[in-house]
């Protein structure tokens, strides 16, 4: 959509239409609402001042990119947002040439902008990278690593800081407000450059005094940090005033330097129920536009079970501590932080720091619970090895959102943790099958010596109370949930895969043995060797990738124990990234729904 010839009135009307479209679709499909509603004017101004055909538009995390999608030819397709085969909720180059880079994890945008700026310079092109990053993403060290180099190299680059919670800086009284407005003006930027030129002609003493005055001046302005890093600073700018935004972006573009444009916006702008700081409206399911109430009431989730179980554990043991990285509500850790603020912390987007700080607490005799989404644990892999495993410390890594996460898609799938953690010495891995086993697992985790990784799904467990009388958790022990003495086939489940195996066994009239592996590491050697003597065909059910997954782990076990007469078939994910869409739709697409799985086993005619 070409908007460069529109006047201000027309642009404001366009912003209104974009908000209406976002509300219409997100209320039907779910998605990231408040961040997108708050960024509409920013993105319209970006498209007005810069050239989306040539300038790389880089969205940090990119869950604020809906307006960008609507402005780049996806208005009609937008109704398929986050559906299987439809528009992604994040930027995706395969979807549109206007999506410069895949995004979904935080704080990558400035590094990408630096790399793009280097490439543009080497190619001798007249383009400029434009990165849009939120104040939350600015809490991660990677953003500062990138700004540190950018300030040194001075590549032309625009960083738009979307400060939608005012957590970085607030205007300090009338003086600061005046200075901020002045700094956003073209006159000030030209004046500042001219003054710097004139200062070079002043005698050394006077120049030194002028320099000290300038430093003092910056101490009472919000841009001090960024200017100390070597970046030019414009702002704060009202992120909902198109005239101010366009003016500030034009000034930034003309400077041919690395520039931070600090904008302040309101999350949820334009939808009264979402305006402000309510985290509930960040990511939402389908909801009623009039009431704001969700259209479906979710079943009791694994996250709720974990939160309540850990709350009970922390009430009993004063050495239980915990941390999450910018996901207190999503992980259920908000309840712990509220109940025990001196023992549970949200450290913002800082997974590496979260792990290492808890390692020191484990060393001091505390029992840390590091509660992070499976996909984000990838960001702290080195710290798990270097600071927890090598030290052989007793801590718990609780990984929420393991397996298919549905609509968020490939950047958020929690399917790699088994593979990357299994390779690390001194790590034990287990997964609950249902609510009762999860509660037992949390109780067990407190007495477990060493590093224990627990994975659990987004949403609810497939199983409920079918096996409430099963044995309690014991280190490295698997459980035979249902035995068929005549069977030669075993369905082996891990985590939520046990529920899938159980439902398949119903389709097969229970003519198989049903096993809950419980521990992927250490394995229950005696149990598995005895199982191999009876059952010669094993079907594996796990929400994980095949490479390095449960099937590979069990195949390696059989090889190591010289057991060559057992056939393993694994229902895990192939070596490709998973599509976004509702979880049942994705499972059906992959052939991992219950009917398809049962049919595959029946067609084998071996069981």
Swiss-Prot record:
Cofactor: Mg(2+); thiamine diphosphate
GO cellular component: cytosol
Top-level EC class as recorded in UniProt: transferase
Binding site for Mg(2+): 135, 164
SMART domains noted in UniProt: Transket_pyr
Keyword Transit peptide listed: no
Binding locations of thiamine diphosphate: 63, 104-106, 136-137, 164, 271, 351
InterPro entries: Dxylulose-5-P_synthase, THDP-binding, Transketo_C/PFOR_II, Transketolase-like_Pyr-bd, Transketolase_BS, Transketolase_C, Transketolase_CS
Cofactor: how and how many bound: Binds 1 Mg(2+) ion per subunit. Binds 1 thiamine pyrophosphate per subunit.
MF terms in GO: 1-deoxy-D-xylulose-5-phosphate synthase activity; magnesium ion binding; thiamine pyrophosphate binding
GO annotation terms (biological process): 1-deoxy-D-xylulose 5-phosphate biosynthetic process; isopentenyl diphosphate biosynthetic process, methylerythritol 4-phosphate pathway; terpenoid biosynthetic process; thiamine biosynthetic process
Reaction catalysed by this enzyme: D-glyceraldehyde 3-phosphate + pyruvate + H(+) = 1-deoxy-D-xylulose 5-phosphate + CO2
Keyword Magnesium in record: yes
Pathway assigned to this chain's UniProt record: Metabolic intermediate biosynthesis; 1-deoxy-D-xylulose 5-phosphate biosynthesis; 1-deoxy-D-xylulose 5-phosphate from D-glyceraldehyde 3-phosphate and pyruvate: step 1/1
Keywords carried by this UniProt record: Isoprene biosynthesis, Magnesium, Metal-binding, Thiamine biosynthesis, Thiamine pyrophosphate, Transferase
Enzyme Commission number(s) from the entry: 2.2.1.7
Subunit structure: Homodimer.
Entry-linked NCBIfam families: dxs, PRK05444.2-2
Function: Catalyzes the acyloin condensation reaction between C atoms 2 and 3 of pyruvate and glyceraldehyde 3-phosphate to yield 1-deoxy-D-xylulose-5-phosphate (DXP).
Protein family according to the UniProt entry: Belongs to the transketolase family. DXPS subfamily.
PANTHER family (UniProt xref): 1-D-DEOXYXYLULOSE 5-PHOSPHATE SYNTHASE-RELATED, 1-DEOXY-D-XYLULOSE-5-PHOSPHATE SYNTHASE, CHLOROPLASTIC
Protein's name in the database: 1-deoxy-D-xylulose-5-phosphate synthase
Organism of provenance: Campylobacter hominis (strain ATCC BAA-381 / DSM 21671 / CCUG 45161 / LMG 19568 / NCTC 13146 / CH001A)
């Amino acid at each position: 959509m070409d908007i460069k010839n529109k006047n201000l009135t027309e642009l404001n009307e366009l912003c209104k239409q974009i908000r209406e479209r976002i509300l219409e679709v997100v209320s039907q499909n779910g998605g990231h609402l408040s961040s997108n509603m708050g960024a509409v004017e920013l993105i319209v101004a970006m498209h007005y001042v810069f050239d989306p055909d040539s300038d790389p538009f880089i969205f940090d995390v990119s869950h604020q990119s809906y307006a960008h999608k609507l402005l780049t030819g996806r208005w009609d397709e937008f109704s398929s947002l986050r559906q299987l085969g439809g528009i992604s909720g994040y930027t995706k180059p395969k979807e549109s040439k206007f999506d410069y880079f895949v995004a979904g994890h935080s704080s990558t945008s400035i590094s990408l902008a630096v790399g793009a700026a280097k490439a543009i310079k080497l190619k001798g092109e007249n383009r400029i990278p434009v990165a849009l990053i939120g104040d939350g993403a600015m809490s991660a060290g990677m953003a500062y690593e990138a700004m540190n180099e950018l300030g040194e190299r001075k590549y032309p680059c625009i960083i738009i800081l979307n400060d939608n919670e005012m957590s970085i800086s607030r205007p300090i009284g009338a003086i600061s407000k005046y200075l901020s407005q002045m700094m956003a003006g073209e006159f000030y930027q030209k004046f500042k450059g001219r003054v710097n030129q004139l200062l070079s002609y002043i005698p050394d003493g006077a120049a030194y005094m002028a320099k000290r005055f300038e430093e003092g001046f910056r101490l009472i302005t919000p841009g001090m940090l960024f200017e100390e890093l070597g970046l030019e600073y414009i702002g704060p700018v009202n992120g909902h005033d198109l005239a101010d935004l366009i003016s500030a972006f034009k000034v930034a573009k003309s400077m041919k330097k690395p520039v931070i444009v600090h904008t302040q916006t309101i999350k949820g702008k334009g939808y009264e129920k979402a305006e402000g700081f309510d985290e509930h409206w960040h990511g939402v399911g389908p909801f009623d536009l009039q009431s704001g109430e969700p259209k479906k009431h979710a079943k009791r989730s694994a996250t709720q079970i974990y939160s309540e179980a850990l709350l009970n554990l922390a009430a009993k043991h004063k050495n239980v501590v915990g941390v999450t990285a910018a996901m207190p509500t999503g992980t259920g850790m908000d309840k712990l932080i509220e109940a025990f603020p001196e023992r549970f912390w949200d450290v913002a987007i800082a997974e590496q720091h979260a792990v290492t700080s808890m390692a020191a607490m484990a060393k001091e005799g505390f029992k840390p619970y590091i509660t992070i989404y499976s996909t984000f644990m990838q960001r702290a892999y080195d710290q798990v090895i270097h600071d927890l495993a090598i030290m052989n410390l007793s801590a718990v890594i609780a990984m929420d959102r393991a397996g298919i996460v549905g609509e968020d898609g490939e950047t958020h799938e929690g399917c790699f943790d088994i593979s990357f953690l299994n390779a690390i010495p001194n790590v034990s891995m287990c997964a609950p099958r249902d609510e009762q086993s999860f509660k037992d697992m949390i109780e067990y985790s407190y007495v477990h010596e060493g590093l224990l990784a627990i994975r659990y799904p987004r949403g609810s467990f497939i199983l409920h109370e079918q096996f409430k009388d099963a044995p309690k958790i014991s280190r490295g022990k698997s459980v035979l949930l249902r035995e068929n003495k005549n069977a030669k086939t075993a369905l082996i489940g891990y985590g939520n895969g046990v529920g899938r195996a159980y439902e398949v066994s119903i389709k097969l009239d229970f003519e198989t043995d049903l096993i809950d592996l419980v521990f992927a590491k250490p394995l229950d050697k005696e149990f598995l060797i005895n199982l191999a003597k009876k059952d010669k065909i094993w079907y594996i059910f796990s929400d994980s990738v095949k490479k390095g997954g449960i099937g590979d782990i069990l195949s390696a076990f059989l090889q190591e124990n010289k057991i060559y007469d057992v056939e393993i078939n694994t229902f895990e994910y192939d070596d490709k990234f998973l599509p976004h869409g509702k979880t049942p739709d994705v499972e059906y697409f992959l052939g991992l729904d219950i009917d398809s799985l049962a049919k595959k086993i029946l067609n084998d005619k071996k069981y």
